[in-house]
């Protein structure tokens, strides 16, 4: 499994995202640059320029027509994927830490930072695909304010029914996506260990969280029941669920500030594969020289990518043994 090394960033990666077809990969980092890559060969398609601060987050619409980015310059920008032009800028009072399109692409959520007297909030923006994308709404159609603990990450559940948010205090909440009312709140991780990532299954009925408390949890979108727990030996920055095979991929490593002159092995800078059902670790992929900040998987389950503190994105296309590997019980199930 030889990785394709994508070097288009000068500073550490913050998020990577495959589009729905899996032919494109978008990456953002702390150097203000947004890159688009071909997944198959790692060739860079181009960049989206305009942000004035670190770009924390990126998402691409389900039809790969629009790209959204959120940045430390307190703005969300909407880009035309094909031409690279910025079609809309929304200004916020604080930095934007996470953006995500709803499953039908008609709305975009933005998670804003708690700072300078402003409470953390989740804003929902309505997205229009008419008139060359020029007439976007100026104000959010819904704003959810986090009075208790600020939201660090958020996403949409199945059919865009709920907004699921992970918080700084390790809890996960479920909000009604129409009204913004909080329906559920579960202390999924150790108290005060923030949730660094939330990624959904393909049908969005369950999701995985990655936390500073060195664990990842598989949680149901409907009632926030904790289904599985994956325990690692290092703080986790990102986690994703693989289609095709029942695995999850976790990425982490010692926080950059805690790393002294450790070797890559000691820093535990590897992508870890766990069995989704049995919760066992089944393998690791080394390569990054520094913690993994973000992992993403190809929607067909044929490849995965990781973005590190070292400024590189590594794309791995899976080999045959990856797909052939099975537990004995899984084999027996196949025979029946």
Curated annotation (Swiss-Prot):
The molecular function terms of the Gene Ontology recorded here are: RNA binding; translation initiation factor activity
- Top-level taxon: Eukaryota
Repeat positions for WD: 8-47, 50-91, 146-185, 190-229, 287-326
Specify whether Cytoplasm is a keyword of the entry.
Answer: yes
Pfam family of the protein (one): EIF3I
**Protein localization:** Cytoplasm
Q: Which cysteines are joined by disulfide bonds?
A: none
Which range is the signal sequence, renumbered to this chain?
none
Q: Which GO terms describe its cellular component?
A: eukaryotic 43S preinitiation complex; eukaryotic 48S preinitiation complex; eukaryotic translation initiation factor 3 complex, eIF3e; eukaryotic translation initiation factor 3 complex, eIF3m; nuclear periphery
Q: Which UniProt keywords apply?
A: Cytoplasm, Initiation factor, Protein biosynthesis, Repeat, WD repeat
Matching entries from InterPro entries are given as: eIF3i, WD40/YVTN_repeat-like_dom_sf, WD40_repeat_CS, WD40_repeat_dom_sf, WD40_rpt
One GO term of the biological process aspect: formation of cytoplasmic translation initiation complex
Reported function: Component of the eukaryotic translation initiation factor 3 (eIF-3) complex, which is involved in protein synthesis of a specialized repertoire of mRNAs and, together with other initiation factors, stimulates binding of mRNA and methionyl-tRNAi to the 40S ribosome. The eIF-3 complex specifically targets and initiates translation of a subset of mRNAs involved in cell proliferation.
Q: Which family does it belong to?
A: Belongs to the eIF-3 subunit I family.
Cite the record's note on assembly. Component of the eukaryotic translation initiation factor 3 (eIF-3) complex.
Descriptive protein name: Eukaryotic translation initiation factor 3 subunit I
Where does this protein come from, organism-wise? Answer: Aspergillus terreus (strain NIH 2624 / FGSC A1156)
């Amino acid at each position: 499994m030889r990785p394709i090394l994508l070097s288009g960033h000068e500073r550490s990666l913050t998020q990577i995202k495959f589009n729905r077809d899996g032919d494109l990969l978008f990456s953002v980092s702390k150097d203000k640059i947004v890159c688009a890559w071909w997944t198959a060969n790692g060739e860079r398609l181009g960049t989206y320029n305009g942000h004035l601060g670190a770009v924390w987050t990126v998402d691409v619409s389900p039809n790969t027509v629009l790209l959204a980015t959120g940045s430390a310059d307190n703005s969300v920008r909407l880009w035309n994927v094909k031409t690279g032009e910025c079609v809309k800028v929304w200004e916020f009072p604080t930095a934007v830490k996470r953006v995500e399109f709803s499953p039908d692409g008609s709305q975009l959520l933005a998670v804003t930072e708690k700072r300078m007297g402003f409470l953390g909030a989740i804003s929902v923006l309505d997205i229009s695909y008419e008139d060359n994308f020029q007439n976007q709404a100026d104000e959010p159609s819904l704003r959810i304010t986090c009075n208790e603990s600020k939201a660090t990450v958020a996403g949409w559940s199945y059919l865009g029914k709920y907004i699921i948010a992970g918080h700084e205090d390790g809890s996960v909440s479920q909000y009604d996506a129409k009204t913004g009312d909080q329906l559920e709140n579960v202390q999924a991780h150790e108290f005060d260990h923030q949730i660094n990532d939330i990624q959904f299954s393909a049908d969005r009925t369950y999701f995985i969280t990655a936390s500073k408390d060195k664990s990842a949890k598989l949680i149901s979108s409907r009632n926030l029941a904790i289904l599985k727990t994956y325990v690692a030996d290092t703080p986790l920055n990102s986690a994703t669920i693989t289609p095709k095979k029942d695995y999850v991929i976790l990425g982490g490593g010692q926080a950059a500030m805690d790393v002294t002159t450790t070797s890559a092995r000691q820093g535990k800078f590897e992508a870890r594969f766990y069995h989704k059902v049995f919760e066992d670790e089944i393998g690791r992929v080394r390569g990054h020289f520094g913690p993994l900040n973000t992992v993403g998987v190809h929607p067909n389950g044929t490849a995965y990518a990781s973005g590190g503190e070292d400024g590189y994105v590594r794309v791995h296309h899976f080999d045959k043994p990856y797909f052939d590997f099975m537990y004995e019980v899984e084999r027996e199930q196949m025979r029946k």
